[in-house]
Amino acid sequence: MLQLPDGRGRPSPHTEEMQITEIYKSLQGESTYAGMPCVFVRLTGCNLRCTWCDTEYSFYGGKKMTPEQVFDEVQHLRAVSGLIEITGGEPMLQERELVPLMQRMVDSGYRVLLETSGERPLDRVPPGVIKVVDVKCPDSGEGDTFHIENLETLQPHDEIKFVISGRSDYEFARDFAVRHDLARRVNAILFSPAFRKGASGARDASNCLIDPQELAAVFHADH
């Protein structure tokens, strides 16, 4: 991974190394796998700058690791659930090394989640990997970045996520889901309230940019 002066990643020339921000074990906090023990592999670098991003520390730095070293660390930390999440940053900026690594994880019996914005093509993601695609809404500042051809790569086990900071984001997400018939394409469509950038402490309702009860009320009124 090459780093641009502003920290935005771009695809690197062929290399045997990846740029890794952190690898750790915790409980999954998002998607339909929330609450499950999980090993997180956070890759360094992102080509987007969402206004509410809470992982800006992954834009820069990190350490170089070979795919073999990453796999060994995952094996060492192995969660009892066998769940791994590949996240970032934007993991697909390191597609060349990441794709075979994910395939190896799947072949070794792991359940692998790939969290991605869908800004980069996803056609090379191994079919056994569960894509959790975070389609950016307008208030993120990156609302036109989703690679629309990625809709054709979606599988029934995949999930689509929208981070909502206000009514306009909700309407965008609703219309996108209906227009592209997402309910028939994926396992789950997730609406998540955005949190204030730099908010300290726990992720609770007081830090939300939109009240979760308000979001729920609008959602139920539409259905």
Predicted regions and their residues:
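Conserved AdoMet/S-adenosylmethionine-binding subsite of the radical SAM
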Residues: L93-H223
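Residues in well-ordered beta-strands of folded domains
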Residues: T21-Y24, R42, K161, L190-S192
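Conserved Radical SAM active-site core
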Residues: L2, H14-K25, P37-C38, T44, ...
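N-terminal/domain-start segments enriched in small and hydrophobic, helix-friendly residues
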Residues: Q28, T32, S58-F59, E152
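Short, glycine/acidic-enriched capping/hinge loops at junctions between secondary-structure elements
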Residues: S31-A34, T51-D54, A202
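Short secondary-structure boundary/capping segments within folded domains
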Residues: G29-Y33, G45, A221
